[in-house]
Amino acid sequence: MIELHQVSKSFNVNGKTVEAVKNVSITVEKGEIFGVVGYSGAGKSTLVRCINLLERPDAGQVLIDGKNLSTLSSKELRVARRKIGMIFQGYNLLKTATVYDNIAKPLKLEGVPKDEIEIRVNKYLSIVGLEDKRNNYPSQLSGGQKQRVAIARALAHEPEILLSDEATSALDPETTEAILQLLLKINAELGITIFLITHELDVIQRICDRVAVMENGHLVEQGTVLDIFTKAKHATTKRFVGSEASFDIPQDLLEKYIATGKLVSLHFIGDEADEPALALVSRKFDVLPSILAGGIDHLKNGTLGKLLVHLKGDEAEYSKAIAYLKESGVVVEEVELL
């Protein structure tokens, strides 16, 4: 378990104090995939580096399985860090070392026996699907393959926690999807807790169980991925998930629709995404629904259907229709112009 209690971290930049992380508290359960999302400068990278004390917090506590890392001696901290692997956007591979040696060298420095190193390197190269690349050099690999080597290197220490600092942000969409599937596999098969930071909402929705949203060093909202997608409260979260969204429909067109009825965002969760609730509205009530835009998001634990709908009818019938949709399990939010 990862517990952050009122963690703060600041830096001195050109004589000025910059507060990168401000009183952040997060609890991540064992075996969970937890994501932190935010725009550039939100404090995400500083926060993730506080977990293994690559950045030592100015205030607050970082607890791993109940143990306060800040109180450990240098030797004890080195031992604790072996259970916390980390991958980065930039891979950080040794250019003059083979794939095998990039994974093996850190183990040698830890004093792992040669036979055990051979076993671990082969095991984790197999898990990341690079058995045939063990004698290649980084320059001979694609970006996705380099990231797989970095993941294998982190796993070779057999950690209980894997930290990911924007690990997919430099990859193309297809390679990103492959890396995300690999992280899901690692989580499911090895039981490793994953704490990742990203500015890509697709990453969050594809693999995370829960998510926190950061802005200007503050944690502004957190919850399950489904709750964040359907019940976003903070303005920053809403900008990310588009819960106030217009699906990129021009503002003047939105104004036209709102002037002639109600504009609502509908979210159909799980099995409800396949139910004809909206189709039944026009039969049961004196309202005319028009679908303006829509889509389906595939979350880690289910499906989320999204529709932007114009409802035309009198206020009483509109209220009945909305009540019916909510009773049918649909999350309804009236869209207002910003």
From Swiss-Prot:
Gene3D superfamilies per the UniProt record, alphabetical: 3.30.70.260, P-loop containing nucleotide triphosphate hydrolases (3.40.50.300)
GO cellular component, one term: plasma membrane
InterPro entries: AAA+_ATPase, ABC_transporter-like_ATP-bd, ABC_transporter-like_CS, ACT-like_dom_sf, MetN_ABC, MetN_ABC_transporter-like, NIL_domain, P-loop_NTPase
Keywords of the record: Amino-acid transport, ATP-binding, Cell membrane, Membrane, Nucleotide-binding, Translocase, Transport
Positions annotated to bind ATP: G38, Y39, S40, G41, A42, G43, K44, S45
Positions in coiled-coil regions: none
Subcellular location: Cell membrane
EC number: 7.4.2.11
Group of enzyme by EC: translocase
Catalytic activity line of the entry: L-methionine(out) + ATP + H2O = L-methionine(in) + ADP + phosphate + H(+); D-methionine(out) + ATP + H2O = D-methionine(in) + ADP + phosphate + H(+)
Transmembrane segments annotated in the record for this chain: none
Span of domain ABC transporter: 2-241
GO MF terms, alphabetically ordered: ABC-type D-methionine transporter activity; ATP binding; ATP hydrolysis activity
Membrane protein topology class: Peripheral membrane protein
Its job: Part of the ABC transporter complex MetNIQ involved in methionine import. Responsible for energy coupling to the transport system.
Subunit structure and binding partners: The complex is composed of two ATP-binding proteins (MetN), two transmembrane proteins (MetI) and a solute-binding protein (MetQ).
Similarity field: Belongs to the ABC transporter superfamily. Methionine importer (TC 3.A.1.24) family.
Protein name: Methionine import ATP-binding protein MetN 1
